[in-house]
């Protein structure tokens, strides 16, 4: 999981 993907997760 990339940093950008983690942001979209929230």
Curated annotation (Swiss-Prot):
Main location, first listed in the record: secreted
Organism: Sarcophaga bullata (Grey flesh fly)
Family indicated by similarity: Belongs to the FARP (FMRFamide related peptide) family.
Record's subcellular location: Secreted
Source species, domain of life: Eukaryota
GO cellular component, one term: extracellular region
Phenylalanine amide PTM sites in chain numbering: 10
Name of the protein: FMRFamide-16
Assigned keywords, A-Z: Amidation, Neuropeptide, Secreted
Disulphide bonds in the chain: none
Single GO biological process annotation from the record: neuropeptide signaling pathway
